[in-house]
Design a protein with these regions (language model features):
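C-terminal motif of bacterial Sec signal peptides marking the signal peptidase cleavage site
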Residues: 16-18
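Bacterial N-terminal signal peptides that target proteins for export
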Residues: 1-8
Length: 344
């Protein structure tokens, strides 16, 4: 097991002044000519209005049962079936971001959440037979307001709006490492295969941070006005058989950008639009995203779940926010058609 160094690592990221200081851009649903995909399901709207839903996490058990967790950052965490029905919830405070791991010993999932009400990390246990969620422990954070969060099997990474990201153990020991960015961060994901941490600095881009402490952080992808459009929000990694893909929410133009993890080459940029019968709307202003590469009978390549910041019904009437559920094959079909980029 690779251990994190006991260090404080601070660095001055590249600042894209045109993005950081320019006029704000209107939110749009889709750029002209952008590739598009549709969701096959959506969750019930969260019970709270305004900006409430935020970050999802996908749980697939060894027997193929699938449960989607999502934060309601006004009250806690909710659990949904793959069809989108709410099946459990816990009111534990303003939980902003979540991530988790499967615990083989207990045959359950452990989910960590950044709780802005208590300024803590909450750790939950989720069982799938029956489906239930319980708060098992919490630990205090020396942060002004916990915000972004991601995990590995051994560590929890949590950041605040001041650009500070800290590493903690699951039992609350830490911080054992601190990474300081120049501006606000949120989305992050751990590449457990290569021991790297990817952090989205919202108006600057995506940083790759080597967790061995020996390699300086590097800017993996910079924001611009065409591809990765700030804010940079949710991040997640899809590990395939022959290559891995980093997926990012490009919130500034309500799209998603896929990168080859090894080369940082952009594979695709796409939007999620309404189904042909408008039974499921598209997405706008997405915060959190989650991917799963676990195969099930119905979805042999896995799943993508994204938050929808402007949820509407079939008649275009506004609803509370929710999460959209997609088949990863539909996402993968948007990648470059050359065989080098396909993972079949």
């Amino acid at each position: 097991m690779n251990k994190l160094p006991y260090l404080i690592l601070s660095f001055a990221p590249l600042v894209i002044s045109a993005c950081a200081n320019g006029p704000s851009k209107p939110r749009v649903s889709m750029a002209d000519g952008m590739r598009t995909v549709t969701a096959f399901a959506e969750t019930q709207p969260v019970p709270d209005d305004d900006d409430a839903a935020d970050d999802p996490y996908i749980m697939v058990t060894p027997t193929g049962d699938t449960v989607v967790a999502g934060t309601n950052k006004r009250r806690g965490v909710e659990l949904y079936s793959l069809g989108g029905q709410r099946i459990a919830s816990i009111d534990s405070g303003r939980v902003n971001n979540i991530d988790g791991i499967y615990d083989v010993q207990s045959a359950s999932f452990r989910i960590a959440g950044s709780n802005r009400t208590t300024t803590q990390v909450d750790v939950y246990q989720v069982t799938t037979e029956p489906v239930a969620i319980s708060l098992t422990t919490s630990f205090d954070l020396p942060l002004k307001e916990p915000y972004g969060l991601c995990v590995s099997p051994t560590h929890i990474y949590v950041g605040d709006k001041d650009g500070v990201v800290q590493a903690w153990t699951w039992d609350g020991q830490g911080p054992i490492a601190t990474f300081t960015f120049e501006s606000q961060t949120e989305g992050c994901v751990v590449d457990t295969r290569n021991n790297d941490l990817y952090v989205g600095e919202e108006m600057t881009g995506i940083w790759r941070v080597a967790l061995d402490g020996e390699t300086p952080p590097s800017l993996f992808a910079a924001t611009d006005d065409q591809n990765l459009v700030g804010d940079v929000e949710g991040l997640d990694i899809y590990h395939g058989e022959s290559r891995s893909v980093l997926l990012a929410s490009s919130q500034g133009d309500s799209s998603y950008v896929a990168y080859d993890l090894a080369s940082a080459e952009q594979l695709a940029k796409f939007a999620i639009t309404s189904t042909p019968d408008d039974s499921i709307d598209g997405t706008q202003d997405t915060d959190g995203i989650a991917v799963s590469n676990t195969a099930t009978s119905a979805h042999p390549r896995g799943l993508l779940v994204v938050q929808d910041g402007f949820n509407v019904d079939q008649d275009q009437r506004a609803l509370n926010q929710n999460f959209k559920i997609l088949d990863w094959r539909d996402v993968e079909n948007q990648f470059a058609r050359d065989s080098v980029y396909r993972d079949e």
